[in-house]
Curated annotation (Swiss-Prot):
SUPFAM superfamilies: alpha/beta-Hydrolases. This is Uncharacterized protein R595. The keyword Repeat does not apply. Pfam families: Hydrolase_4 (PF12146). It is a single-pass membrane protein.
Length: 294
Protein backbone atom coordinates (compact mmCIF):
# COMPACT_ATOMS: atom_id res chain seq x y z
CA UNK A 1 0.00 0.00 0.00
CA UNK A 2 2.69 2.48 1.06
CA UNK A 3 4.79 1.45 -1.90
CA UNK A 4 1.98 2.37 -4.32
CA UNK A 5 1.49 5.75 -2.63
CA UNK A 6 5.23 6.41 -2.86
CA UNK A 7 5.26 5.53 -6.55
CA UNK A 8 2.31 7.87 -7.19
CA UNK A 9 4.01 10.70 -5.30
CA UNK A 10 7.23 10.18 -7.25
CA UNK A 11 5.30 10.27 -10.54
CA UNK A 12 3.52 13.49 -9.50
CA UNK A 13 6.83 15.10 -8.51
CA UNK A 14 8.40 14.10 -11.83
CA UNK A 15 5.44 15.52 -13.76
CA UNK A 16 5.57 18.80 -11.81
CA UNK A 17 9.32 19.18 -12.33
CA UNK A 18 8.88 18.39 -16.03
CA UNK A 19 6.14 21.01 -16.35
CA UNK A 20 8.30 23.62 -14.64
CA UNK A 21 11.01 22.95 -17.20
CA UNK A 22 8.63 22.61 -20.15
CA UNK A 23 6.25 25.42 -19.19
CA UNK A 24 7.55 27.87 -21.77
CA UNK A 25 7.57 25.18 -24.47
CA UNK A 26 3.86 24.70 -23.77
CA UNK A 27 2.99 28.37 -23.37
CA UNK A 28 5.02 29.83 -26.26
CA UNK A 29 5.27 28.21 -29.69
CA UNK A 30 7.05 30.71 -31.93
CA UNK A 31 7.68 30.07 -35.61
CA UNK A 32 10.91 31.55 -36.91
CA UNK A 33 11.53 33.23 -40.25
CA UNK A 34 10.55 31.26 -43.37
CA UNK A 35 11.77 33.27 -46.41
CA UNK A 36 9.20 31.93 -48.90
CA UNK A 37 6.24 32.51 -46.57
CA UNK A 38 7.45 35.99 -45.69
CA UNK A 39 7.84 36.83 -49.38
CA UNK A 40 4.25 35.74 -50.05
CA UNK A 41 3.06 37.66 -46.99
CA UNK A 42 4.64 40.94 -48.11
CA UNK A 43 3.33 40.40 -51.64
CA UNK A 44 -0.21 40.17 -50.24
CA UNK A 45 0.31 43.27 -48.10
CA UNK A 46 1.36 45.21 -51.19
CA UNK A 47 -2.13 44.69 -52.60
CA UNK A 48 -3.78 46.43 -49.64
CA UNK A 49 -2.30 49.87 -50.29
CA UNK A 50 0.49 51.75 -52.04
CA UNK A 51 4.09 50.70 -51.22
CA UNK A 52 4.84 54.02 -49.51
CA UNK A 53 2.12 53.24 -46.95
CA UNK A 54 3.83 50.05 -45.76
CA UNK A 55 6.78 50.46 -43.40
CA UNK A 56 8.85 47.53 -42.17
CA UNK A 57 11.20 48.20 -39.26
CA UNK A 58 12.81 46.75 -36.15
CA UNK A 59 12.09 48.45 -32.83
CA UNK A 60 14.56 48.08 -29.97
CA UNK A 61 13.22 47.39 -26.48
CA UNK A 62 14.89 48.78 -23.33
CA UNK A 63 16.60 45.40 -22.88
CA UNK A 64 17.98 45.47 -26.46
CA UNK A 65 15.58 43.03 -28.12
CA UNK A 66 14.66 43.82 -31.74
CA UNK A 67 10.95 43.52 -32.54
CA UNK A 68 9.94 42.87 -36.15
CA UNK A 69 7.27 45.50 -36.80
CA UNK A 70 5.11 46.47 -39.77
CA UNK A 71 3.05 49.64 -40.09
CA UNK A 72 0.29 49.56 -42.74
CA UNK A 73 -1.05 53.08 -43.17
CA UNK A 74 -4.70 53.61 -44.04
CA UNK A 75 -4.68 57.13 -45.47
CA UNK A 76 -8.46 57.46 -45.15
CA UNK A 77 -8.37 57.70 -41.36
CA UNK A 78 -6.34 59.05 -38.44
CA UNK A 79 -7.12 55.95 -36.34
CA UNK A 80 -4.92 52.92 -35.81
CA UNK A 81 -5.15 49.39 -34.44
CA UNK A 82 -2.27 47.65 -32.67
CA UNK A 83 -2.59 43.90 -33.20
CA UNK A 84 -1.40 41.39 -30.56
CA UNK A 85 -1.28 37.84 -31.92
CA UNK A 86 -1.54 34.59 -29.98
CA UNK A 87 1.09 32.28 -28.52
CA UNK A 88 2.06 30.52 -31.76
CA UNK A 89 3.30 31.32 -35.24
CA UNK A 90 4.42 34.78 -36.39
CA UNK A 91 3.03 37.85 -38.15
CA UNK A 92 3.51 36.32 -41.61
CA UNK A 93 0.64 33.96 -40.73
CA UNK A 94 -1.79 36.81 -39.91
CA UNK A 95 -2.60 38.32 -43.30
CA UNK A 96 -6.35 37.64 -43.18
CA UNK A 97 -6.90 39.43 -39.88
CA UNK A 98 -4.65 42.31 -40.98
CA UNK A 99 -6.69 42.69 -44.16
CA UNK A 100 -9.91 42.68 -42.11
CA UNK A 101 -8.66 45.31 -39.64
CA UNK A 102 -7.26 47.51 -42.42
CA UNK A 103 -10.84 48.21 -43.48
CA UNK A 104 -11.24 50.28 -40.32
CA UNK A 105 -7.87 51.90 -39.57
CA UNK A 106 -4.13 51.80 -40.00
CA UNK A 107 -2.70 48.57 -38.60
CA UNK A 108 0.48 48.03 -36.59
CA UNK A 109 1.57 44.40 -36.29
CA UNK A 110 4.64 43.02 -34.59
CA UNK A 111 6.18 39.79 -33.38
CA UNK A 112 6.97 39.32 -29.72
CA UNK A 113 10.58 38.56 -28.85
CA UNK A 114 11.71 35.16 -30.21
CA UNK A 115 8.81 35.04 -32.71
CA UNK A 116 9.40 35.33 -36.44
CA UNK A 117 12.25 37.70 -37.21
CA UNK A 118 12.33 39.27 -33.75
CA UNK A 119 15.37 38.48 -31.62
CA UNK A 120 15.42 36.86 -28.18
CA UNK A 121 14.70 33.43 -26.71
CA UNK A 122 11.34 32.09 -25.59
CA UNK A 123 12.94 29.60 -23.18
CA UNK A 124 13.35 32.23 -20.47
CA UNK A 125 10.53 34.52 -21.63
CA UNK A 126 7.85 35.69 -19.19
CA UNK A 127 4.89 38.04 -18.90
CA UNK A 128 7.08 41.02 -18.05
CA UNK A 129 9.06 40.50 -21.26
CA UNK A 130 5.91 40.63 -23.38
CA UNK A 131 4.75 43.64 -21.39
CA UNK A 132 8.03 45.36 -22.30
CA UNK A 133 7.48 44.46 -25.96
CA UNK A 134 3.93 45.86 -25.91
CA UNK A 135 5.02 49.10 -24.24
CA UNK A 136 7.81 49.51 -26.80
CA UNK A 137 5.26 49.32 -29.62
CA UNK A 138 2.85 51.68 -27.82
CA UNK A 139 5.57 54.28 -27.24
CA UNK A 140 6.60 54.13 -30.90
CA UNK A 141 3.01 54.61 -32.08
CA UNK A 142 2.56 57.60 -29.74
CA UNK A 143 5.94 59.31 -30.08
CA UNK A 144 7.02 58.45 -33.62
CA UNK A 145 3.79 57.90 -35.51
CA UNK A 146 2.11 60.68 -33.49
CA UNK A 147 -1.22 58.96 -32.91
CA UNK A 148 -3.43 60.34 -30.18
CA UNK A 149 -3.95 57.64 -27.49
CA UNK A 150 -7.72 58.03 -27.86
CA UNK A 151 -7.38 57.14 -31.55
CA UNK A 152 -5.71 53.80 -30.86
CA UNK A 153 -7.47 50.46 -30.51
CA UNK A 154 -5.79 47.38 -29.02
CA UNK A 155 -6.80 44.13 -30.73
CA UNK A 156 -5.79 40.84 -29.11
CA UNK A 157 -6.24 37.19 -29.97
CA UNK A 158 -5.80 34.32 -27.48
CA UNK A 159 -2.69 35.02 -25.39
CA UNK A 160 -2.48 38.39 -27.13
CA UNK A 161 -5.66 39.40 -25.27
CA UNK A 162 -3.78 39.17 -21.98
CA UNK A 163 -0.87 41.18 -23.39
CA UNK A 164 -3.29 43.87 -24.62
CA UNK A 165 -5.15 43.97 -21.29
CA UNK A 166 -1.89 44.31 -19.40
CA UNK A 167 -0.81 47.21 -21.63
CA UNK A 168 -4.16 49.00 -21.28
CA UNK A 169 -4.04 48.69 -17.49
CA UNK A 170 -0.44 49.90 -17.30
CA UNK A 171 -1.46 52.94 -19.33
CA UNK A 172 -4.37 53.58 -16.96
CA UNK A 173 -2.12 53.30 -13.91
CA UNK A 174 0.70 55.48 -15.20
CA UNK A 175 -1.16 58.34 -16.85
CA UNK A 176 -4.10 60.61 -16.08
CA UNK A 177 -7.68 59.60 -16.82
CA UNK A 178 -7.72 61.38 -20.20
CA UNK A 179 -4.86 59.25 -21.55
CA UNK A 180 -6.33 55.90 -22.62
CA UNK A 181 -6.76 53.70 -25.70
CA UNK A 182 -10.09 54.11 -27.46
CA UNK A 183 -11.00 50.43 -27.37
CA UNK A 184 -9.91 46.93 -26.45
CA UNK A 185 -11.06 44.09 -28.72
CA UNK A 186 -10.46 40.60 -27.35
CA UNK A 187 -10.96 37.49 -29.46
CA UNK A 188 -10.90 34.21 -27.48
CA UNK A 189 -9.38 35.47 -24.21
CA UNK A 190 -8.91 33.42 -21.05
CA UNK A 191 -10.03 34.56 -17.60
CA UNK A 192 -6.60 33.78 -16.19
CA UNK A 193 -3.94 31.27 -17.12
CA UNK A 194 -4.24 29.43 -13.80
CA UNK A 195 -8.04 29.18 -14.17
CA UNK A 196 -7.61 27.79 -17.66
CA UNK A 197 -5.25 25.08 -16.36
CA UNK A 198 -7.79 24.16 -13.69
CA UNK A 199 -10.54 23.99 -16.32
CA UNK A 200 -8.54 21.64 -18.55
CA UNK A 201 -7.80 19.19 -15.72
CA UNK A 202 -11.36 19.42 -14.38
CA UNK A 203 -12.69 18.19 -17.72
CA UNK A 204 -10.23 15.29 -17.49
CA UNK A 205 -11.55 14.44 -13.99
CA UNK A 206 -8.23 15.47 -12.45
CA UNK A 207 -9.39 18.54 -10.54
CA UNK A 208 -7.02 18.14 -7.58
CA UNK A 209 -4.06 17.67 -9.88
CA UNK A 210 -5.13 20.76 -11.82
CA UNK A 211 -5.33 22.84 -8.64
CA UNK A 212 -1.72 21.98 -7.84
CA UNK A 213 -0.42 22.58 -11.36
CA UNK A 214 -2.29 25.87 -11.70
CA UNK A 215 0.14 27.36 -9.19
CA UNK A 216 2.87 26.98 -11.81
CA UNK A 217 0.94 29.22 -14.21
CA UNK A 218 0.49 32.41 -12.22
CA UNK A 219 1.17 34.76 -15.12
CA UNK A 220 -1.44 36.50 -17.27
CA UNK A 221 -4.03 36.99 -14.52
CA UNK A 222 -6.42 39.16 -16.53
CA UNK A 223 -9.08 38.89 -13.83
CA UNK A 224 -6.79 40.74 -11.41
CA UNK A 225 -6.08 43.54 -13.89
CA UNK A 226 -9.56 44.37 -15.18
CA UNK A 227 -10.61 46.49 -12.15
CA UNK A 228 -7.83 48.97 -13.02
CA UNK A 229 -9.00 49.49 -16.60
CA UNK A 230 -9.90 53.04 -17.62
CA UNK A 231 -13.69 53.31 -17.72
CA UNK A 232 -13.63 55.25 -20.99
CA UNK A 233 -11.99 52.43 -22.95
CA UNK A 234 -14.63 50.46 -24.85
CA UNK A 235 -14.29 46.68 -24.54
CA UNK A 236 -15.54 43.97 -26.89
CA UNK A 237 -15.06 40.28 -26.11
CA UNK A 238 -15.77 37.59 -28.71
CA UNK A 239 -15.62 33.84 -28.19
CA UNK A 240 -16.83 30.67 -29.88
CA UNK A 241 -18.59 27.69 -28.31
CA UNK A 242 -16.47 25.58 -30.67
CA UNK A 243 -13.13 26.88 -29.40
CA UNK A 244 -11.11 23.73 -28.73
CA UNK A 245 -8.13 25.50 -27.11
CA UNK A 246 -9.58 28.13 -24.77
CA UNK A 247 -13.03 27.13 -23.46
CA UNK A 248 -15.92 29.48 -24.22
CA UNK A 249 -16.58 29.78 -20.48
CA UNK A 250 -13.21 31.47 -19.99
CA UNK A 251 -14.06 34.38 -22.27
CA UNK A 252 -17.62 34.72 -20.99
CA UNK A 253 -16.47 34.65 -17.36
CA UNK A 254 -14.02 37.45 -18.12
CA UNK A 255 -16.82 39.44 -19.76
CA UNK A 256 -19.06 38.99 -16.71
CA UNK A 257 -16.30 40.35 -14.51
CA UNK A 258 -15.81 43.33 -16.82
CA UNK A 259 -19.54 44.03 -17.15
CA UNK A 260 -19.87 44.35 -13.37
CA UNK A 261 -17.62 47.40 -13.28
CA UNK A 262 -17.35 48.60 -16.87
CA UNK A 263 -20.37 49.99 -18.73
CA UNK A 264 -18.65 50.22 -22.12
CA UNK A 265 -18.46 46.47 -22.73
CA UNK A 266 -20.10 43.94 -25.03
CA UNK A 267 -19.91 40.17 -25.58
CA UNK A 268 -20.36 38.56 -29.01
CA UNK A 269 -20.64 34.86 -29.79
CA UNK A 270 -18.59 33.96 -32.85
CA UNK A 271 -18.35 30.68 -34.79
CA UNK A 272 -15.58 28.35 -35.84
CA UNK A 273 -12.54 26.95 -34.08
CA UNK A 274 -9.84 28.69 -32.06
CA UNK A 275 -7.50 29.32 -34.99
CA UNK A 276 -10.22 29.73 -37.60
CA UNK A 277 -13.00 31.70 -35.94
CA UNK A 278 -16.03 32.57 -38.01
CA UNK A 279 -16.97 36.23 -37.71
CA UNK A 280 -20.77 36.66 -37.89
CA UNK A 281 -22.50 39.80 -39.13
CA UNK A 282 -23.05 41.00 -35.55
CA UNK A 283 -19.30 41.04 -34.98
CA UNK A 284 -18.56 42.89 -38.22
CA UNK A 285 -21.34 45.44 -37.62
CA UNK A 286 -20.27 45.97 -34.01
CA UNK A 287 -16.70 46.74 -35.04
CA UNK A 288 -17.97 49.01 -37.81
CA UNK A 289 -20.10 50.93 -35.29
CA UNK A 290 -17.21 51.03 -32.83
CA UNK A 291 -14.81 52.57 -35.32
CA UNK A 292 -17.40 54.85 -36.92
CA UNK A 293 -18.15 56.33 -33.49
CA UNK A 294 -14.51 57.31 -33.11
Amino acid sequence: MYKKILIILIIIIIVIISLIYLKNFILYQPHKDHPVKYCKFFHKLSKLTEPENIHHLYLKTPDNILLDTIVIRNTDTNKCIIYFHGNAGNIAMRYNIIKFLFNYASVIVFDYRSFGRSTGSFITMNQQDLSTDAETIWNYVIKNLHYNPNNISLFGESLGCSVAINLAVNISKNFDSKYYPHSLILNSPFYSLSEMVKSIFHKANLSQFGSVLSNLFREYQSDKLIPFMNQHTKIIIAHSHNDEIIPFEQGFKLYQLIANTHTNSKFIIINGSHNNPGLPDEYIYTLADLFNDW
